[in-house]
């Protein structure tokens, strides 16, 4: 099955797939800007810096790509993993660094200017730290001077400049958490929406999504819902469900609104101005105004 990851900058969509193709498309003109075949399946999200497109392959090799022509500028080899699970390499960046969490469980901070490693730390809790050990995490989050990593079974909050652990909390999330700046929001396997203070690691609130949805709709039977993704827009939480519904929740954990999307989510939605952009489960681009 073909799997796509994409990122948008200005009017260009950059796409990487699990076959090894990397390409740029002008979505306004609907024309291909460039296309390259790197012949290794890509296995990460994409990030953009001033001149570079960053992506990692299935062997945990991190690429710096010229975003204007698709040519490789530099790569970073990291630990390979023989066995694969559902975890993809995760990239995040700020103005000065790219942060790379690979499928071995190692988190790297790489300085963008000179493309050198600033620090790295391994978060794999397996007793067998070998290329056969499996590590799972949600995509990493950068929040000011912190890095948030939601792995199985721990939530880590680390100092961005040093990699030192500030918070280590025994909780795992079935989706990528989201940070408001002071709080991190996640969803557990029991469909609990949990809010955790990023400085203290204490739980601010925990609500049962199924029960609260039933209460909001005024139904007696408890709903059986499954969360897919979560976002923050205009200081409100948007909880996207696998059944194509979206629940809008305020920062105190109260449901405000429930709506239905016209097509199922295939990728994490991107919010651009007043529009929501995502790929559906058939890899078709959906733009909602």
Name each model feature, range by range.
Residues 17-18, 50, 57-58, 102-103, ...:
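Structural signature of WD-repeat beta-propellers
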Residues 13, 22-25, 53-54, 65, ...:
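Fold-core signature of tandem repeat domains
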Residues 1-8, 31-50, 72-95, 116-144, ...:
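Extracytoplasmic beta-rich repeat domains
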Residues 98, 139-150, 157, 236:
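Extended non-catalytic domains of envelope/secretory-pathway proteins
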Residues 23, 63, 108, 117, ...:
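WD40 beta-propeller blade core
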Residues 26-30, 66-70, 111-115, 159-162, ...:
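Short loop/turn segments that connect beta-strands within beta-propeller blades
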Residues 162, 236, 241-289:
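C-terminal closing repeat unit and adjoining cap/tail of repeat-based domains
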């Amino acid at each position: 099955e073909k799997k796509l990851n994409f990122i948008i900058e200005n009017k260009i969509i950059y796409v990487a797939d699990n076959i090894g193709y990397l390409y740029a498309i002008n979505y306004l003109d609907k024309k291909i800007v460039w296309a390259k075949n790197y012949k290794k399946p890509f296995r990460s999200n994409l990030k953009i810096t001033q001149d570079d497109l960053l992506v990692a392959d299935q062997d945990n090799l991190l690429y710096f790509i010229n975003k204007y022509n698709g040519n490789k500028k530099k790569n970073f080899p990291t630990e390979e993993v023989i066995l694969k699970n559902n975890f993809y390499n995760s990239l995040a960046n700020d103005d000065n660094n790219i942060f790379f969490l690979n499928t071995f469980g190692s988190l790297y901070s790489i300085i963008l200017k000179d493309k050198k490693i600033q620090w790295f730390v391994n978060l794999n809790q397996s007793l067998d730290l070998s290329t056969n050990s499996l590590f799972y995490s949600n995509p990493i989050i950068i929040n000011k001077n912190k890095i948030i990593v939601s792995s199985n079974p721990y939530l880590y909050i680390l100092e961005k400049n040093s990699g030192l652990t500030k918070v280590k909390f025994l909780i795992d999330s079935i989706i990528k958490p989201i940070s408001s700046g002071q709080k991190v929001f996640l969803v557990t396997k029991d469909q609990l929406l949990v809010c955790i203070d990023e400085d203290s690691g204490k739980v601010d609130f925990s609500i049962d999504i199924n029960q609260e949805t039933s209460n909001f709709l005024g139904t007696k039977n408890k709903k059986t819902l499954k969360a897919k993704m979560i976002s923050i827009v205009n200081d409100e939480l948007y909880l996207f469900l696998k059944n194509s519904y979206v629940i809008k929740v305020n920062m105190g954990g109260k449901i405000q609104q429930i709506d239905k999307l016209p097509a199922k989510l295939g990728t994490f939605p991107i919010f651009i101005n007043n529009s929501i952009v995502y790929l559906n489960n058939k890899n078709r681009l959906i733009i909602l105004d």
